[in-house]
Amino acid sequence: MQEDRWSYLWLILGALCLLFSNGKWIVPLAAWLAPLLLIRFLRTQPVGRGLLIAALVHGVIFYVWYVDVIPAGFVPGGLAGFMAFMALMSLIPLGPYAIDRWLSGRLPGFAGTLIFPLSTVALEFANAMLNPMGGWGSLAFTQTDNLPLLQVVSVTGMYGISFLIAWFAGVGNWAWAAGMDWRRVGRGILLYGMVLSLVLLGGGLRLALWSPVMASGRMDGAVERKANRGTAFFPPETATVRVASLSGFDYRYEGEPFTPDDARHIDALFEATVREARAGARIVSWAEASAMIDARDEAALVRRAAEVAKQESIYLQISPYFEPAGERAVNKSILLTPEGEVGWEYWKSRANLLEGTVLGDGNVARADTPYGRLAGAICWDMDFPNYIIQAGRAGADIMLAPSADWRQIDPMHALIARVRAVENGVSLVRHARGGLSAVYDYQGRTLAAVDDFVTTVDRTMVAQVPVHGVRTIYAAVGDLFAWLNVGALALVVGTALRQRRGYVRS
């Protein structure tokens, strides 16, 4: 254990940074500083006391982050089940600190700086794979406005950013413990600085030299689709297509009875669809559950949408939501083609256990069009990187992800989807009922945005969207980077356990 009379000051400062490093209020720099300070606190405290205090701090802050983000009704078991779920989830971000505190003294020198990033990535990966709510809480989601850094997710997935942030904390504490003696720590600091600089430089070059070539004005006709989507995650030159997306004009939650107001609302959506089509939109997308209907009216809704799509020569994605009597609710995305045919019929496929809707078949929707290959998912589906990777592997160019949020996850939920777009080389149209709607290109630039809680008059969103996506290394190799971290951590833990057994025998 290291001695530091300022130990509790680092705890206080670390807790303040932690509060603003995720959840409702994100200050990107705080996400880098919080682990640096909290690791310092833990390494200067007895193991048991330090971890107990850290667990309490994480529990309180996690509750503040997510108390209104996760509706209590989503978790079975009533209030007790909800509190147990919150307590369990708060332990996930604590895990890397506990592993670091256990192993930091067993792996000396610069190699010890890797314990915290390896364990951070391993636990984030496990969370994304096993958590029924998806990969919420990743450090990567705190850095989405840093576009040069964000480009690394096209290679490593979201875990590359998390690794760099956590490694900063590991290197910083190693240098701190050495008294910042440059002769001892200089080469290690330079190595970390070189890695981070190369990531930022590579991302900056990708943004500057291989960005989408934006066509000016609106596109009224088809665009020839190129077979080559680019190589090594560098895009071909591309044109754009005008995409319009529409939200609910009055926000309401699912599960309420169908009313005549819903019928009038659907009429307004069709009127807006025709208006945007005649203004040049070739693709029109409705937000999740925009069409609250009686189960018996689904066929009529689809027929009407098909007629509008054929009449206006557009691709129209509609979002019916209905609750058959005595059955689970149905949450769909249906794409109608300019020929009046159904291009896809997609059921929401993730978080259904919590929402209680009919489970989809587990395949991301896709359709080939003159404007590129479209892919489709719904809202919460975007929180699962191992699911949305299907879009990247299918060579999707534009992804339509109708969504429905609430104030407490605005804008957090949109930021998660932004990372998915860059990971998979797709431009993303995400229109949210009751939250931040945004269009991102495949490098994470914001092409359009509108927030239901800010805009009260017209929530239509229009953008010129690249018709060609780009292949990414992440889509090709999947979570290889995360698995390498898991393997390296297992090797370190195994070595530590063997050393412990040898010490006990002696």
Show where each model-derived region lies.
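Residue-level signal for alpha-helix termini/capping positions
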Residues: 43, 177, 274-278, 310, ...
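Short, basic and Ser/Thr-rich N-terminal targeting/leader segments
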Residues: 23, 327-329, 433
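Soluble catalytic regions of membrane-associated enzymes that act on cell-envelope
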Residues: 203-354, 367-370, 374-376, 380
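Membrane-embedded alpha-helical bundles of multi-pass enzymes
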Residues: 1-225, 407, 420, 440-443, ...
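CN hydrolase (nitrilase-like) catalytic-core segments centered on the catalytic cysteine
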Residues: 92, 118, 283, 290-291, ...
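Active-site catalytic loop in hydrolytic enzyme cores
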Residues: 69-82, 107-108, 119, 125-156, ...
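Generic structural signal for well-ordered alpha-helices
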Residues: 96, 100, 269-274, 364, ...
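A structure-centric signal for secondary-structure junctions around beta-strands
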Residues: 33, 136, 238-240, 330, ...
